[in-house]
Amino acid sequence: KAVGDDGMIHGVLFANFHDDKADVSQWRENIEAQMTDHERERFRLLADYMLEVDGKTVQCMSDGEVKLSLFISNQKGCGKLLLQEMMDEFLHRDLRHLYLWTDTSCTHEYYPQHGFTLVGQFLSEVYDSYAPGYTTYIYKKGI
């Protein structure tokens, strides 16, 4: 995480190895029970989309590689600093590549401008019915 001079968190990064598994079914069941029908429908669509693109990203990966699973920044420059700190940590751990996925709702143009290579691009089978033409991009970068 990145904390500013004001003591507020301005960015967060999470990453995992390609073979990491997390069972979120109980959490998902609990959270869905608190939702309206409309919220539940939207939540399931987004969760299914994330499972789809995470799976496609992991298929591109091998041992010794890591996936950026969450990258949020609300202050200009904070994300770049967080990403560099993370890359330094991964280099220290002798990891080879960092993978991530992004889509047309994000600033996906950032990644090729900062040394990432596009390794996949596709229209989501899950999300296309909700947002036709919604494109997902998979990038990788050497560590």
Walk through the language-model features, giving the residues of each.
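Conserved beta-hairpin
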Residues: 1-13
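Active-site beta-strand termini and strand-to-loop segments that position acidic
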Residues: 3-5, 140-143
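Conserved acyl-donor/pantetheine-binding loop and adjacent beta-alpha core of acyl/acetyltransferases
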Residues: 14, 19-70, 74, 126-132
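Conserved GNAT acetyl-CoA-binding A-motif
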Residues: 62-67, 90-103
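Conserved acetyl-CoA-binding loop-helix of GNAT-fold acetyltransferases
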Residues: 75-90, 113
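Short glycine/proline-centered loop/turn elements that form peptide/ligand docking sites
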Residues: 79, 83, 104-109, 123-130
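Conserved catalytic-core motifs of GNAT/GCN5-like acyltransferases
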Residues: 99-101, 117-135
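Conserved active-site tyrosine of GNAT-family acetyltransferases
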Residues: 110-112, 116
